[in-house]
């Protein structure tokens, strides 16, 4: 189960396929990306994590000088390219600087397994520091994630934050890795939590140094006192909608919640682009 979940066949490594998917799904992205490339405005940067994993991100400065900066975090088996629609929202529509990391074992980043947000929270925190340096050491920053990227965002939110971090946006993130894997085990294979979940959890602790219950967005949001905007589709059956109510309840004020009518998993922006943009704005 551990390899099935953390080392799936599709790990967001096919960049050309990712670009093709994004241009087909969001046709307005291609002229924007082409313009960025023509003007050498879409840039790559690499860093090393404390455990010596090479990590990659794309970044794009706003067309006008600004402190407003968004760090945008992708979902499970996706990569930074697959979050370019949110990059467009912030950079093209709202005039933000943006940085979009490839999480471990996706895109151009190293690593040997997906980390479900828990180790990624440390990497994203490092990327937030990098983005602040790139954009002048005096940014006003939002962190925005979708799906596993939203869980990562919430896991980040429970850590101590520098003054430049102002708020978080989580779109359809799960309560914990334990809850999400338990749900998938039951739905895909008809199996109970015991014994497989407990065995896989133990193996994850041995191999990666973290456990399924430890990797809890629910516990982390309870420690966050910065503003957070929760978004979830009411037709989401992959990360079920009930999870957002528990997360929202656990988070201290200030907070806001938007349940998006008729939206399934990770498609709230696709199906409600203008309203999504206005609410994030």
Regions from the language model: what does each represent?
Residues 86, 217, 226, 240-249:
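Short alpha-helix in the alpha/beta-hydrolase fold that links the catalytic acid
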Residues 223-225, 230-232, 236:
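Short beta-strand/loop motif that positions the catalytic acidic residue
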Residues 76-90:
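The serine-hydrolase catalytic nucleophile loop
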